[in-house]
Amino acid sequence: MEHQFTVPAIKQAYSDDFTRFGRPGVVGYWFEMDHPYEGHRNFADTNDIYLNTYNWRRILRPNTTVIDIGGHSGDTAVPMGAMTGGTVLTVECNPVVRPWLEFACQMNRHLAKYIVAHEAVTTEDNVMVTFSDHGNQMCNGGLVDHSWGIGAGNNSIQVPGVTLETLCRRYLTSEEINRIDLIKIDTEGHDCLILDSSREFIDSLRPTIIIEWFSSFDNAQAEAMFEIIASLDYVALYPKNFKFADATEPSEDLLLIHRSKLDDFLR
């Protein structure tokens, strides 16, 4: 069957063999954006960082569903699909970078079932929210909601927003929802607010969760983040070494494990 694709402007195309990560014969492809504010990244090195340094190869499990919120150019979605072979729902509300994500998912459809969603994931359904860049011509950015108190940069657009549960039910089958095993959230400081507003849905699945420790958080915001994590009955670990995380010792990301699954995870 013939397929036609729109090819975005690409600076460099890469392939990587995932045999060294325990997936013999699995080859994935990633395409570096030709954008003035996109720094150079080698695909193999990026995979090594995610899968080895951040231990994703110990977290991603075969034939599961992964939710990738903040998909950008596909640098996280591709290794997620390569390692699971299941379903990857990757979410990118920024229309400037989404063509690279869509192209990467099309070129890697032999790895997994990829679904690209265009909505922002927010704390309530059917809202319009502002996406603003970091002064980088929409290469990256985050949501601006003045009730959340976090802003971004120079260029802004309005994007539709839905809750995590609504997003999953909109794009996934019931079987795929039941197989959700990992949720990665990178929403520039709103990660725990999204979890807090989706606590019943999260508790029904109790997946592993990866969130960003937003670099602009002050001590009070970090404490509030840890309070939300604890209220969800999750435990925060540092992904590089699986040690218990502390609100006074920042990390780029946090790995969240439901308390009922912690002993099995650490065993």
Enumerate the language-model features and the residues they cover.
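S-adenosyl-L-methionine
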Residues: 1-168, 171-177, 238, ...
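Residues that form or flank phosphate/diphosphate-binding pockets in enzymes
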Residues: 75, 99, 125-126, 193, ...
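Conserved acidic-Pro-Pro-aromatic motif
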Residues: 86, 90, 167-267
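Short internal loop-to-helix segment that lines adenine-nucleotide cofactor pockets
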Residues: 43-67, 125, 144-203, 217
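Residue-level preference for nonpolar/small residues embedded in alpha-helices
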Residues: 97, 142-144, 221
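Hydrophobic packing residues within well-ordered alpha-helices of enzyme cores
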Residues: 80, 101, 131, 194-198
